[in-house]
Curated annotation (Swiss-Prot):
Enzyme class: hydrolase
Protein name: ATP-dependent helicase/deoxyribonuclease subunit B
InterPro entries xref list: ADDB_N, DNA_helicase_suAddB, DNA_helicase_UvrD-like_C, P-loop_NTPase, PDDEXK-like_dom_sf, PDDEXK_AddAB-type
Protein purpose: The heterodimer acts as both an ATP-dependent DNA helicase and an ATP-dependent, dual-direction single-stranded exonuclease. Recognizes the chi site generating a DNA molecule suitable for the initiation of homologous recombination. The AddB subunit has 5' -> 3' nuclease activity but not helicase activity.
Amino acid sequence: MSIRFIIGRAGAGKTRACLEAIRKELLARPYGPPLILLVPEQATFQIEYALAATPGLSGFIRARVLSFRRLAYRVLREVGGAARAHIGELGKRMVLRRLLEQRRSELRVLGRSSGRPGFADTLARTLGEMKTYCIGPDELARAAFDLREKGGAALLADKLEDLAKLCFDLEDYLAGRFTDPDDYLNLLADCLELSAEVRGTEVWVDGFSGFTPQEYRVLAALARTASRVNITLCADPAALSGKIDETSLFFPVRETYDRLLKMALQERIPLERPLILGGNTARFKSPAISHLEKYFFVRPAPPCLNCSEGVVLAAAANPKAEAEGVAREITALCRDRGYRYRDIVILLRDVDSYAGLISSIFADHGIPVFIDQKRPVMHHPMVELVRSALEAVTEDWAFDPVFRYLKTDLVPLSREEVDLLENYVLAHGIRGSRWTDGRPWEYRRELTLEEDPGLNGSESVELEKVNRIRHQATADLLEFCRSFMQAKNVREMSTALFNLLTGLKVPEQLESWSRQAEKEGRLEAAREHSLVWSGFTALLDQVVEALGDEVLEPGEYAAVIDAGLESLRLGLIPPGLDQVLVASLERSRNPEMRAAFVMGVNDGVLPARTFDQGIFSDLERERLKAAGLELAPGGRRKFFEEQYLVYIALTRSSERIYLSYPLADGEGRALMPSPIVARVKELLPDVEERVWPVEPNAALLDDLEFVTGPRRTLSYLASQMREFKAGRRIDPLWWDVYSWFAAGEMREHCKRVLSGLFHSNREDRLPPAVSMALYGRPLRASVSGLEKFRACPFAHFLSYGLKLKERAIFKLDAPDLGRFFHAALKLFGDRVREQGLDWGQLDREQCQEMAGEVVDLLAPRLSSEILLSTARRRYLTGKLRRTVQRAALVLAEHSRRSKFRPVGLELSFGPDGDLPAPVFTLADGSEMAVSGRIDRIEAAPSDEGVYLRIIDFKSGKVTVKLTDIYHGLKLQLLAYLDVALEHARTLTGGNGLPGAVLYFRIDDPLVNTDGPVPPGEEVEREILKKLRMTGLVLADPKAVRLMDAGLDGISDLIPVQIKADGSFAARSAVLTREQFALLRSYLRFQLASAGSEIIGGTVEIAPYRKGRYRSCQSCPFRPVCQFDLLVDGNVYRSIKDEDEGAIWSKLGRMCRKGWGQ
């Protein structure tokens, strides 16, 4: 037994010396005693591959490349101790959560933090650290007692006592039941000398800068058992003797060396003469890299003149541009310099911040890459299936979890069937017992509030299909729900969850996905599909082992599983042999790399400045060390250890190293380069500096550098063609690139990509045959549809031509409320008529009583009983009742003060309507029939005939402007008036005269007051003012007084003000009889003109802008039309409020010319 040190700086050939010694043994004696190479866990695959690639060595059985943990497993399996079930990290965290909950009231410090997210993980790491540093509960309790005796550290003593209690509890829980993985190395140290496999073997220990107390115990046992233990130390041999400063680069290694010497002395293990590897010729072929290795941490240091070959500093605009630059450089190295992808490594201080960018960008460049990090699984469909199934049964079958479950592609339904079911459930607000009661669904979304006429044939077929899909979708989930909710403990809950997955044949589906991914060359995805099932079953095993007999609420169990899945990571090995390796600086132990890219060399990132302190602060760690309890280094010590990571970064490659840094983060915030950059410039004054632009830029980089993989080059080509199209000069190289694509296999793809350069987002006219098929002849149109056409022809085409609709959602929106108010006021009016009452004679009590009856009758009919579905919506029913009561009161007040009485309520016109449809002859000679529904027509007799006024109910504030009528945006009131006047004799028996077109606002407004609450009459008067109708009124005092008999000054009812001399004030919205006639004539022209354009195929994307309003604001079709002001051809039609006199002049001229004849 003996120990030999192999000492040398980075690049001196320590790993090579270990591998060569093992290779020599394997070639000399293939069947001799075992040879063990101990390396960090993350390096096992790379080192084993390097060993297997030995020329002349077709295979080996003697050599073992192991980590400490894997060595423990092998030895315990040999000598005993591996049979007892082990509790994994996830299981231990679950146990700790339970123990924390039970002990919370007794814990002085940790109890206050026990409910904080992630605290159980922090606690588990701290207890693991205690085990690693061989500190048990007795030592913790003793240290707490000593600190209290000395005084001044009460908080630290409380922490130690809390940890001691939890440590005792954890050990009691695990005793005789489980093996804690944190105890593996202690168990290994205790029984290593019993192992026949290790006894007499030679061991090499490589790649470690330091060891934990547990690992020191294992090394001592190895030294006693093996024939020789070779330990490599990465340090300058001179640093291992004499005094050395704590801030020195090799101080941590010196501490390790001193401790190993002390261990050998205590164990009486002989020390062999160390193997000192001097010089840098073993690895570095670049003098510049060799100079950095030797002098980077030496001050003062001589600069290396004219020897910067192999070192590049690169700045990029942001991390994306940086990743693009790295991809281009890698392509150039492999294409022009004969590198293989496996010769290249990308080193990162924080892999997570770059992993996504590198994956997507390298795929575009066609560069195979392996990112050395354990993959989270939360994105995987199987994990989503588990989480959503648990969430569905614990959250009363809410919409989101149920359909997340169904959309995993692991439930036996097609996506089309899931979509159909989703639309139905969204439309009817189905959740809870309506999923589980077994009764067939027969909900329908009613478009009216009339009596239910029953199911028609197509509705019956659709409901039958929906119910069939529902049964197929929920059969397994219902069975899981039943067994899960009846489970008596965690074991039975886990069994129910496992049965759900096996019932759905999830393992078989994952295997199928894995095979398919492998066929498509997606090797990492294939491996991930294979591992996720074993990872999940291992998690379930740990849950059962740790909490099997515990009784948890369903929500608590779901939280345990969710936490376990969130911390579950899949460790993948490189699926290919020729890939770029992406690794963390802390995990990088890769031999023989020719080129290294160190990304993210920014201030505060490399070297890092902030560290997770865990439960103990740096000061507390120092106090514990003084008290004899040594823990892992604190933040201060870690900051010095960052120097060693910088040293690793600078010395990983033999030929080339690229240090790159973004100048801003992804959100544009400025970033500074790391001090490393300035230091490299000091040592290498001639170092090559580059700027990696986002797009080709000849001033910064040769355009040829951007010609990489076909996919990425094509996107660069598109950007250059855009520059050329804009009139700017581009490098002739891009025409050669274009020719290559145009003549090759990717010409169709190239054509599609470049077609976007000429995209104008314009719509051509529809061919006559298409227009005929969509709209038919005669054209049937509604007034609101023609208004929509004037607002935007394309929106009209989508809505009335293609009949696109937003999918129905179970919610109470403005159209629903509008339908409700219209139906309520019609029913109210019908009851007034049926009971022989006059609107003007209705008192407050009658209005309130009748309105309440009407609302109670209609509420269950609205959108599948939506008003009865929740307490909030039932409260809303009361608000609707008050609003309808207020509308009835205001209408009654109108009747008391006017001579106008209703002659039509919710009166329809058009085919099958109450009144015939107005028919217009269009430009091509065909006809258009216009339909609509008039909310309320009122009439008042006069000497000249019968005045008619149109009232349109609105739940919001609406006004009428002549500009809107002129541009065809608001035609409904005039169209309704025109229809009423055309059929006045049918409605009234007399000659119809235009009286007014008005909007009636349905609301129950609040009255603001600065002082005491005013009397009731004053409040009612203020409410009347707030609900004053808007619109246009005949400029005839007689007609006006028929609408407001007591009018004196400003009317509370209509938009009119009469001055003292009897004339109308300027603020009055009045029109003469001639103006009404002119507008009626213009209305017919507008409707016929719009109809002619529709059948002529006009579908242009032409929304309008008026002031701050854009017609796109409330349009549901924006994702379809993709209107964008930045795209050629997309511009708003600007509509301005013109002077009314100017508009009347235009209308007069148009009328005299025959409306455009």
